[in-house]
Amino acid sequence: MGKRKANHTISGMNVASAQGQGTGYNEEFANEPLTPAERQNNKKRKKNQ
């Protein structure tokens, strides 16, 4: 889990711009199906952002 969370920051640009575009983080969740627990967690995070 920790590795997946930090994956979008290793894309080569600084952390702020990577998060602003949201490419790596959102792409990973779109590519693989979530377990029910992960889906619940993802919804909560979206609301907090």
From Swiss-Prot:
Principal localization reads: other
**What is this protein's expression induced by?**
Expressed only in the forespore compartment of sporulating cells.
Which domain of life does this protein belong to?
Bacteria
User: What's a GO biological-process term for it?
Assistant: sporulation resulting in formation of a cellular spore
Asked whether the UniProt record includes Cell inner membrane among its keywords, one would answer no
Alphabetical GO CC annotations of the entry are: endospore-forming forespore
What the entry lists under InterPro entries is as follows:
SASP_SspO (IPR012613)
Q: Where in the cell is it found?
A: Spore core
The alphabetical list of record keywords is: Sporulation
Is Ribosomal protein given among the entry's keywords? no
Q: Where is the composition biased (Polar residues)?
A: 8-20
Record region (Disordered): 1-49
In Pfam terms, one family for this protein is SspO
State the family it belongs to: Belongs to the SspO family.
Q: Cite the HAMAP family for this sequence.
A: SspO
Protein name per the record? Small, acid-soluble spore protein O
Q: Which organism is it from?
A: Bacillus cereus (strain G9842)
Q: Organism classification, top ranks? A: Bacteria, Bacillati, Bacillota, Bacilli, Bacillales
What gene, per UniProt, encodes this protein? sspO
